[in-house]
Amino acid sequence: MPTLVYIHGGPGGGVTFGLFPQFMHIVPQVDPYPTATMAGAGYAILFPMPRGGAGYGEAGQRAIVNAWGEPDYKDIMAGVDQLVAQGVADPNRLGVMGASYGGYMTNWIVTQTGRFKAASAGASLSDLSDTFYLSEGGAFLIDYFKRPWENRDGYAAHSPLTFADKVTTPLLIQHGEADPRVPIAGAWKFYRALKAMGKTVELEVYPRGGHVLREPMQQREQMRRNMEWFAKWIRTGS
């Protein structure tokens, strides 16, 4: 069946379950990816818990130091492969989505593989140096990559923007205009890079929106657009 991969934020977060999965490291919120509704529409939903996230102890979290997009990417794709092997996931109808670090991983994944037919990245990082310099909390990257002038190669090698030319998956980028945690500059840079290369990409900017959208009408529109995006690119017929 068509399968959507939901990647949690963090990276040190995780997923709880209910009508809407919540990021464990952020206050309760309406998630932009209504997975219960998506499941009702005929999608299988994979909630991977890759290394770097909650539940693996210090060693598991340190596995992604100077290595974002490496062991975590392998873990996510191993989960996809398992569902395909079990006959649950149709390998020709895969989608990937996530916000914050989940958005970063979504951006990263579409630069590394063409297996997904559609992707949606919310409040996502594309240029790690930008995040360090422009985010109100960018100093957290020091724990993973040191400072940009101390590790230029590491920042570039783990930034999706560096590999924008590799993207073949249609990508929807959603971002709050006033996001203080992951400034919108990165979304614009990734969008313009992909657009300049003729890639299939759309950018939705939510006025007044922060790292998490708080206005009910914007929350509803964000969910609606995600449902619409995956329906457009992934056929849900059994």
Where are these regions (language model features)?
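Short beta-strand element of the alpha/beta-hydrolase
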Residues: M1-G10
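Serine-hydrolase catalytic-loop signature spanning alpha/beta hydrolases and amidase-signature enzymes
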Residues: P11-G13, I45
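Active-site-proximal cap/loop segments of hydrolase catalytic domains
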Residues: Y6, Q22-S238
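A flexible loop/linker signature enriched in serine peptidases of the S9 family
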Residues: T16-F17
